[in-house]
A protein has these predicted regions:
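Proline-poor, low-complexity alpha-helical tail modules
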Residues: 130-168
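Exposed alpha-helical structural elements
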Residues: 48, 75, 110-113, 117, ...
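Residue-level detector of alpha-helix boundaries and kinks
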Residues: 13, 20, 121, 134-135
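Short, compositionally biased, intrinsically disordered N-terminal export/targeting signals
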Residues: 1-37, 150, 163-168
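Extended alpha-helical coiled-coil "stalk/arm" regions
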Residues: 53-89
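Extended, non-globular alpha-helical segments
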Residues: 84-126
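Long amphipathic alpha-helices with heptad-repeat character
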Residues: 25-28, 32-35, 39-56, 60-63, ...
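Extended interaction regions within the primary functional domain
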Residues: 43, 47-51, 103, 156-159, ...
Length: 168
């Protein structure tokens, strides 16, 4: 598609139409590439969430086995705060706990809150990825349609030129 300029200046309606079709194809391609980059970013975040979920489940199992509490890693807590995800705010003795006053210790049941929140967020990311993939498919369809239109216009123009050259 980068060869749109290589068609040069022309007055043939077919070639002008072909150039327009190629420009539209380039635009569709650029839009698809933008969504592909967004999908790559979302997939990386989805992997990060999956890793955090695995760690949280391991910590929940440790808390269950010991009958006590395990500590939420700082990076998990930061991620959850950054994305407004819920986790248990229970603290020792604070009547209205906040994220600032909450401890990072969770028993087996308290881990459920964080795990469910991460799972819901992971599903949201998955839905977002699927939606963006539909957009990519749409832009790819547009790209194919525009390039086929350009090819048809060029072939039609060439047939006309050939007929003129033969004197038909």
């Amino acid at each position: 598609v980068s060869s749109v300029g290589s068609l040069g200046t022309c007055t043939s309606v077919n070639f002008i139409f072909a150039k327009l079709q190629m420009e539209l194809a380039a635009s569709a391609k650029d839009s698809a590439l933008g969504y592909i980059k967004q999908i790559e970013g979302a997939q990386a975040e989805q992997k990060e969430v999956a890793d955090m979920l695995q760690r949280c489940r391991e910590l929940q199992n440790q808390a269950k086995d010991s009958g006590g509490c395990t500590e939420m890693p700082a990076d998990v807590r930061e991620f959850m705060d950054k994305n407004n995800l819920t986790y248990d705010l229970t603290t020792g003795g604070v009547s209205k706990p906040t994220k600032e006053t909450a401890d990072s210790l969770h028993n087996k049941d308290e881990w459920d809150v964080a795990i469910q929140s991460l799972q819901a967020y992971q599903e949201t990311i998955g839905t977002d990825i699927q939606t963006k993939m539909v957009y990519v498919q749409d832009f790819m369809g547009q790209y194919n349609s525009y390039t086929q239109g350009a090819n048809s216009a060029i072939q039609s123009g060439m047939q006309t030129l050939t007929a003129v050259a033969r004197g038909q």
